[in-house]
Amino acid sequence: MSMTTRAWEELDGGLGSCQALEDHSALAETQEDRASATPRLADSGSVPHDSQVAEGPSVDTRPKKMEKEPAARGTPGTGKERLKAGASPRSVPARKKAQTAPPLQPPPPPPALSEELPWGDLSLNKCLVLASLVALLGSAFQLCRDAVPGEAALQARVPEPWVPPSSAPREPSSPLPKFEAQAPPSAPPAPRAEAEVRPKIPGSREAAENDEEEPGEATGEAVREDRVTLADRGPKERPRREGKPRKEKPRKEERPKKERPRKEERPRAAREPREALPQRWESREGGHRPWARDSRDAEPRKKQAWVSPRRPDEEQRPGSRQKLRAGKGRD
């Protein structure tokens, strides 16, 4: 009975756990082994019971005890069978619970992008393409906008005649001090008066000297006139630099030239006739002095033919060469 009570306690305490089920199965196997062992003992005890009946009544006590033991043992066997029958329905729902575990619910799927974003599926590449298209459109619009007013301005512009840049008005600068034209020292008037009184002879030295002096005087007069005109015009207006005024150098005192003693003029007959100069300068207006022939040189002179440089002795003796030539052919 103690064994049965322990089995009951173990079964009651182990319900609903895997370890209790394993222990219960082990106990059930041991109980089945024991139950199978009891009929073997009963069969083995029946043979001596027949022999004991034949021997005598003294021996009848043993078989009774033997019959009681299987009867006593039989009762726990029926109890074990009852336990098995009662335990089996309890263990089955525990196994079913372990097998039929509720599956884990999958996480809810993320919401679609089309529901949240109004523009739908967009990526970085699409954004870059859109930005580049917008930039191209803006640059093209700007170019068209700049080209239209440029063409209108070119059509409206009229070619103006070229005007030379007028000189800007300059400040009136103080006129520079006018330098007096330095005239060459005039010769003493006495010899000039004498030259005017004397008649000019074309073949004389005085005429040649006068002809040489005339162009010099004419050039001197022309230079004076040019200087006077420049002085009247005044110096050109130039931007004057502010600074110290120029220091005027003291002029050197003009020293009168010493009069050279003039050679005594010889009478015309005593002089050797000298040919007048073939050409002379004539002073004309504008300073142009072409060559002019003298009145005497109206007819062109004939140049002397070339004369061989022969000695006069050879000319006087024309037969001298002939004699020499004749002498060459001697034997």
From Swiss-Prot:
Basic and acidic residues: bias regions: 21-35, 61-71, 222-242, 250-302
Pfam families: JSRP
Region Disordered, residue ranges: 1-118, 157-331
GO cellular component: sarcoplasmic reticulum; sarcoplasmic reticulum membrane
Region called Mediates interaction with CACNA1S, residue ranges: 3-76
InterPro entries in the cross-refs: JSRP1 (IPR026178)
GO terms for biological process, alphabetical: skeletal muscle contraction
Places the protein is found: Sarcoplasmic reticulum membrane; Endoplasmic reticulum membrane
Principal location listed in the UniProt entry: membrane
Keywords: Endoplasmic reticulum, Membrane, Sarcoplasmic reticulum
Keyword Endoplasmic reticulum among record annotations: yes
Biased composition (Basic residues): 320-331
Record keyword NADP present: no
Regions of compositional bias (Pro residues) in chain numbering: 103-112, 161-175
PANTHER family: JUNCTIONAL SARCOPLASMIC RETICULUM PROTEIN 1
Function: Involved in skeletal muscle excitation/contraction coupling (EC), probably acting as a regulator of the voltage-sensitive calcium channel CACNA1S. EC is a physiological process whereby an electrical signal (depolarization of the plasma membrane) is converted into a chemical signal, a calcium gradient, by the opening of ryanodine receptor calcium release channels. May regulate CACNA1S membrane targeting and activity.
Oligomeric form and interacting partners: Interacts with CACNA1S, CACNB1 and calsequestrin.
Protein name (Swiss-Prot/TrEMBL): Junctional sarcoplasmic reticulum protein 1
Organism: Homo sapiens (Human)
